[in-house]
Amino acid sequence: MLVSNHGMTPFTTLLKQQGLPYEVCQNSRDFMRRLARQPASVLIHTHGYKAGVLGRLTAWFTGKSVVSTFHSGDDGEGLLKFYSWLDRTTARFAKCIAVSEPIARKLPVPSTVISNFVPMPATPATVTGNRIAFVGRLSPEKGPEAFCQLAAFCPDGAFHLYGDGPMKSALLQQYGDRVQLHGFQNMANEWHNIDLLCITSRFEGLPLVALEAMAHGIPVCTFAVGGLVNLIDHKSNGWLVEPGHVRDMAELVNYWLRSDGVVRSKMSQAARNTIARGYSVNNRVTDILAVYGA
């Protein structure tokens, strides 16, 4: 159930592609009314600050069980900062799941840490080329401009940016000659076109894009933020870089571009093994069901 009607979005497109039923509410009041009409036996599981606050309050008033997953480690600014505070403050009305330890430490109540998870593709990407990618929302907290700056220091790389957002026009104007912007894409059709994923976020929880890339055998070079610090084993399945240090990331990207097939194959397999051992669907669904039954 989606809180607001934003028309056809990347998320609703994916829901349709997967054949998953969903309801789109017209506003917050409609969302709460629809939740309240659900049978008492229904368990509500919320994601995101708006659905979380409204869902927990509705569940409290109607006596329903509610579980909330907290994904973001970013406090935000302005109105978003207030919403983030309200989200954490109302966490006491729910059983809470945090996708990383740093996020769990920010919550005022005990929570269960369950990392994000992804399915394992049958075959990995080849990672034999020079295609470097950013995948995510083109907004300040994701730092897409830092990714675009890498292109100037890595002349042998082909830089591809996947995603939409408020910074798209500015990025296209400033970096369009060095970085190819693809807009939003169904990444299931794109991972085979990528050899290395770079994450330049200022804040993160545990981004699904990192898990998806590694499940495909694509190593990740990332700023050391949020749950990525625990996911990435530096120089084994990817690389960790001090946040904001673009030149240091460029050195690692250039190392990858110069590396031979043996090095790439070893790191690709290490990335897949990491996901298979700790971040696959089978590992996490049981943990979530345990929270439901607690």
What are these regions (language model features)?
Residues 202:
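Aromatic "clamp/platform" in nucleotide-sugar-dependent glycosyltransferases that forms part
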